[in-house]
Regions:
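N-terminal, polar/Ser/Thr-rich
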Residues: 18-271, 363-367, 673-674, 678
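Hydrophobic helix-coil surface modules that form long, contiguous segments used
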Residues: 234-275, 279-284, 291-295, 364-528, ...
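Beta-strand-rich binding/interaction modules
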Residues: 286-288, 294-305, 386, 635, ...
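Solvent-exposed beta-strand/loop surfaces of large extracellular or lumenal domains
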Residues: 53, 63-66, 71-115, 119-123, ...
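Acidic/His/Gly-enriched intrinsically disordered linker/tail segments
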Residues: 552, 556-623, 627, 650
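Glycine/proline-rich low-complexity spacer/linker segments in large multi-domain proteins
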Residues: 239-248, 330, 339-378, 427, ...
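Zinc-dependent metallopeptidase catalytic helix centered on the HExxH motif
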Residues: 353, 377, 472, 508-581, ...
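Amphipathic alpha-helical substructures
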Residues: 282, 610-706
Length: 775
């Protein structure tokens, strides 16, 4: 069919071609998702819209496309409008990240601080003024194609789409579905050498400039991996941004009716009826995308007035598209009734696997928008269930237990857990009560199965009592050092996974931590980490992915602090810090700063996020703790007061790294720009080569002189390092010394007795490597 169209066009006189400019991207909204998707995936070059290129330059933010010579084809229309082009010939792509952090990322992945790469093929998709610019700078005519660019276009689309579930990049697809104009621009660059590059300018992301490469191939799939991402040039991003997206539909209130029915095999089916109040802060639609767990299928949808609602849901896809009746304006809501079901819960013995703890209901693209929830669960009466929210009603009818849970304040994530649990309640006056839910029968079954396979798994006695004690004691400790938590009741349930999860008033813990408690403190830190999220991540949320260490790093440190202060585990505390330090040292060859959040992990290193955001983030707080420690009395009062102030100031809000820095500076009383630059935004870790000598001076006193050589960091790198001098007879002298620059000689205050030894970097006050050498 396409050949039948192309061949006659080859004979159209050139004088008839290009007289009327093609319409830009703005057009009427699509009546069908699948039809518009089909048009996008069928994009191909037009024989009647071909231009010869000679030194054409396109500039988009920090990127420049210099098309030296070749042929440019406009692509077939989508919704009656031109939204793409393909170029074949010789060109150069230039890209210069504006910040040191993003330049370092480019070095890590491409070996250079700025790109200047030749290319032979370029595919463009756009909703901006690109078409008008091309028509202004080029002359389009009917011509015979020198080569076939269709495979180039087809392969470029594979990086944006999945034909299995008919999904496409949601921001590009929203533009094509809604026929809207914006600054949206995408370029797929096939360079002379190496894998392709993908550049995108996205006005719906606060960090709207991205550069991606091809991720390592998994089978035959093609997927992009972002290596650089930063805000667009021009007016600076407003201070205090606490979201990563704009111009996106959200859901401000959920009313969910969940049915968990037992099947004949003892499994649990899942079905839900959801009333969603769709809202927006800026005009959107009529097509708007949401996310939903891939194994959930939509049965039907209608508006609150009973009219059918048009939705699209690809098979095993994560996107859920809803067509509103019209474009939604700020202040308006569109209540949607959605009915869906699917394979959400698996069973192994008496363990139940909830496959997605957060995407079991439709969510906005950002995934972090706040909403209130009213959730009713219907499930087998012999199962216990725990959920976010306050339990407002519970009744049994026949063999069905119905419970209702509501939230009084907007929250970011809602979840639940259920199983053949026994509950164990722990209470102490002045502390929110804790209900522990565990299936000890499931543990016994699992132990038998593993023994049959030759695997011996230790099983601790008093599982629920052991875990319950850490839950209550960590709550008690955090309430003392941080403040009152946001929830009035806490549930600690077990999940058959190796990780933990925290939601408002609900903590899900790995079955392993119920099965046994290790001797190094790992389990106590793990349990307390999840409890600490009630303060860090829930009580105080993080602003953007750059600030996620304020949740995960803070929670890791909190677990350590609990181990140290509440459980008397000083040796375990410092032992764990040292193990984390070794993990951090392992990342020194290809480092990333904490500030990169989830982007610290990549195809090159999938463990970096855990090590840098969690463990190094905890180290940052530990260093601040030691920096603020009263050395004479070993009291944490200043540090504790600072943490309480931060929690009190930002409770119920999102906080950024800059917000935390301001609180730190208020309590320390001076600028801490250098500290955050080094440890949050930087990647350097110092090595200290330390020598000391002791001299007797007049009056029977002794003088200690330190010589410190600082390596592997910039010349202006500085830290205040704790030094302890052993004076014998259980006496010590404690000092802080400022180490700055490649070489320092530091004279300590005179001492009343001859030193027996000197400990440099006592209390692990600095994340560093210390090597003691002779004078």
């Amino acid at each position: 069919m396409r050949l039948g169209i192309l061949l006659p066009l080859a004979f159209v006189p050139a004088s008839l071609a290009g007289q009327t400019p093609d319409p830009g991207p703005a057009s009427a909204p699509a009546s069908s998702y699948e039809q518009r998707y089909g048009e996008v995936m069928a994009l191909e070059p037009r024989a009647d819209r071909i231009a010869q290129v000679d030194n054409l330059v396109l500039r988009r933010d920090v990127a420049q496309f210099s098309l030296a010579s070749g042929t440019l084809y406009l692509l077939s229309s989508v919704g009656g409008h031109t939204i793409g082009a393909v170029f074949q010939g010789r060109g150069t792509f230039s890209f210069s990240p504006p910040t040191r952090i993003e330049q370092d990322r480019l070095v890590r992945f491409q070996g250079t601080r700025s790109l200047e790469v030749p290319f032979t093929e370029l595919v463009l998709l756009f909703a901006d003024t690109t078409l008008a610019e091309l028509e202004r700078k080029l002359t389009f005519n009917q011509a015979k194609m020198a080569s076939d660019p269709r495979p180039v276009v087809r392969k470029s689309l594979e990086y944006l789409s999945s034909d299995d579930d008919k999904s496409f990049d949601p921001d590009l697809m929203a533009a094509f579905l809604n026929g809207e104009s914006s600054d949206l621009f995408y370029a797929h660059i096939n360079r002379d050498r190496g894998s392709p590059l993908m550049f995108m300018l996205n006005p719906f992301e606060f960090e709207g400039v991205t550069l991606a490469i091809r991720a390592p191939r998994i089978a035959w799939t093609r997927r992009p991996e972002v290596i650089c991402q930063f805000p667009r040039q021009g007016p600076p991003v407003a201070a205090g941004v606490t979201t990563e997206r704009q111009g996106t539909a959200t859901i401000r209130h959920y009313r969910l009716e969940v049915t968990l029915a037992q099947t004949g095999m003892g499994d649990l089916s899942f079905a839900a009826a959801a009333r969603l109040e769709i809202a927006t802060a800026s005009p959107v639609g009529p097509w708007v995308p949401f996310q939903l767990f891939s194994k959930l299928q939509v049965d039907s949808a209608r508006w609150e007035d009973g009219a059918p609602a048009q939705v699209f849901r690809g098979k095993d896809g994560e996107q859920l598209w809803v067509r509103l009746g019209r474009r939604l304006q700020p202040g308006e809501t569109a209540p949607l009734l959605l009915y869906y079901h699917g394979d959400l819960i698996d069973r192994f013995g008496d363990f139940f696997f909830i496959k997605s703890s957060i995407a079991w209901y439709p969510r906005s693209l950002e995934g972090r928008s706040y909403a209130t929830f009213d959730i009713t669960y219907h499930g087998p009466s012999h199962y216990l269930i725990a959920s976010v929210g306050n339990l407002t009603d519970s009744a049994v009818a026949g063999r069905v237990l119905t419970t209702r849970w509501t939230t009084t304040e907007p929250i970011r994530n809602a979840s639940f857990n259920l199983g053949l649990f026994e509950d164990y309640r722990v209470r102490e006056e002045g502390i929110s009560p804790v209900t522990v839910m565990v299936s000890e029968q499931a543990h016994r079954q699992l132990s038998r199965v593993l023994r049959q396979q030759g695997v011996l798994v230790l099983e601790q006695r008093k599982m629920k009592e052991t875990v319950g004690s850490d839950m209550l004691q960590s709550l008690k400790f955090f309430q003392r050092v941080y403040g009152t938590p946001p929830a009035a009741h806490f549930y600690a349930t077990e999940i058959p996974y190796l990780h933990g999860e925290a939601f408002p008033g609900l903590v899900n813990l790995s079955w392993i931590t119920f099965q046994q408690t290790d001797q190094q403190g790992e389990d106590q830190v793990f349990r307390a980490h999840e409890v600490a999220h009630q303060w860090w991540g829930i009580g105080v949320d993080f602003a953007t992915y750059h600030d996620q260490w304020l949740s995960e790093g803070f929670a890791d440190f909190s677990g350590l602090w609990y181990l140290h202060a509440a459980r008397g585990g000083s040796d375990k505390y410092f032992g764990m810090l040292r193990r984390w330090r070794m993990n951090i040292f392992d990342k020194r060859d290809e480092p990333s700063p904490i500030w990169l959040g989830y982007r610290t992990s990549s195809s090159k290193d999938q463990t970096a996020y855990q090590v840098l955001v969690y463990e190094k983030g905890a180290w940052v707080l530990h260093m601040l703790r030691i920096l603020m420690l009263e050395l004479r009395t070993a009291k944490d009062d200043r540090f504790t007061g600072m943490m309480q102030d931060f929690y009190r100031t930002y409770r119920g809000r999102r906080a950024s790294t800059e917000d935390f820095q301001r609180i730190v500076e208020q309590h320390i009383g001076t600028s801490m720009e250098w500290f955050f630059k080094q440890w949050v935004y930087g990647t350097e870790i110092p090595t200290y080569r330390v020598a000391y000598k002791t001299d007797r001076v007049e009056g029977g006193q002794f003088r200690v002189t330190l010589r410190v050589v600082q390596e592997k960091v910039a010349d202006d790198f500085q830290m205040y390092v704790p030094v302890t001098v052993d004076l014998g007879q259980n006496r010590q002298g404690r000092f802080r010394v400022n180490v700055r620059g490649p070489r320092s000689e530091i004279v300590l205050p005179l001492l009343p007795a001859e030193p027996k030894g000197v400990t440099f970097n006592d209390l692990e006050g600095v994340l560093c490597d210390v090597k003691m050498v002779d004078w």
